[in-house]
Amino acid sequence: MVKLNKFHVFMSLTCVYAVFLFYLSSLSSLPGPPELGFLYGLVHFLEDLGLKFLIYPFYFAYRYPDKFAHVILYMGFGLLLNQTLSSSKNGVLSEYAVPFSLLIGTLYGVTDEFHQVFVPYRSASSMDLCADFMGLLFAQLLILVYFGIKRVLSEGRH
C-alpha cells in the first residue's frame, strides 16, 4: 500500500485545481456576478455614517469583477503551488518555492489564455494574464509574510 505524504497530497490538490481553472476557461460564457443590489444599500448606509472609506478596498472588485476573479483564483493556485513545491524532496524546488511558483503559475496562465483563443466567445487577454500574475504574487507575499511573522513570534519565545 502506498503511503501518501504531504507532497503527494498537495500535488493532487494542485492538479485538481489546475483542471478546475482549465474547466472555467473552457466555458463559452462564465457565470455573471451575483446581484449586487444589497451592496448599493450598504454603500449608502456607510456614506450616511461617514464610513464610506471602508468600501475603497473593494472598488477593484466592483469595477473589474472579471479581473478580481482572476486574482482570487490564481491566488489559490499560487498557494497550492507553493505548498506543493515546498514539500518536494527536491532541495532546489523546496528552497526556491516562491520564484518557481510564480514561474510555473505564470506559464500555466499563458497556456490557459492561449487555450481561450479556441473557445467560442472567448479570447486571450494580456490583462487577464496580468491579473493571474498578481494573484500568484499576492499568494507568495502572503506566504512570506505568514512565515516571517511566525519566525518573529518563535524568536520572541526564546
Residue ranges and their predicted role:
Residues 1-120, 126-127, 133-158:
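Bulky hydrophobic segments
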